Amino acid sequence: LGRFFFWLCRTRPEVVKKRLLDELPELLPEGYDIEKHLTPRYNPWDQRVCLAPDGDFFNAICEGKADIATDHIAEIKENGVELKSGEFIEADIIVSATGLDLNFLGNIEVTVDNEAVEPANLLNYKGMMYSGIPNLLASFGYTNASWTLRCDLTSKYLCRLINYMDRKDISRVMPTPDMSQVEFEPLLDFSSGYVVRKSAELPKQGSIKPWVMYQNYIADIFLTRFSALQDGALKFTK
């Protein structure tokens, strides 16, 4: 169901957005400003979609236990937050929900043959390896599903790869794209600020398999479990 909803958001975003907004008046107090507080500038799944189990978030608003302030922050003060509109919100605790800083491999400095590797020049292979870096697999989960799903596929693919290399007495494997056939695209098709801010510094995905970074668990099952290891993109050496 989650996969179908994601597909629908990508293929019919205006239809899904309208349906979601049409359901809100029944969940909120009469006259609540839905356009101001609950109508984002982007379409569903251009950024993450938040779910409210059993409508608990909307119940809290109806009961006066929660409220939404849609504005820009002018200043954080000792006892609350001042907004650009001049409104002041008193607060005992402020929880930061933004400001994530994406870093490739946790800012590990990677070198190959004493040459520093620039992450922005790398091409992702099957969501787990990178062009120009030998013998490296890294888990990178899904933006639209459980993060561990692709981690599980990556670990199983790694076992396949190691067993194959052991049988063939191979010590080195490296994704090597034909650059005349592949166009670079952003690694994540996501408009969240923390992604956009770092997009230019992160590795890229390609326009064709196996360089595409799928956000589709079913597609990745076939790509990792049933595809040939000798696919022309991996370069094996002894």
Across the structure, where does each feature detected by a protein language model lie?
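Alpha-helical scaffolding within the catalytic cores
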Residues: 119-125
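Flavin (primarily FAD) binding-site architecture
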Residues: 96-113
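Core beta-strand elements of the Rossmann-like FAD/NAD(P) dinucleotide-binding domain
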Residues: 84-93
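Dinucleotide-binding/catalytic capping subdomain of oxidoreductase cores
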Residues: 1-78, 159-188
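Glycine-rich, N-terminal phosphate-binding loop of Rossmann-like dinucleotide-binding domains
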Residues: 85, 98-99, 140
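Short glycine/proline-enriched loop/turn "hinge" motifs that connect secondary-structure elements
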Residues: 126-132
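Hydrophobic/aromatic beta-strand patches that form the interior of the parallel beta-sheet core
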Residues: 67-69, 95, 137-139
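C-terminal, flexible cofactor-proximal segment of oxidoreductases
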Residues: 124, 135-238
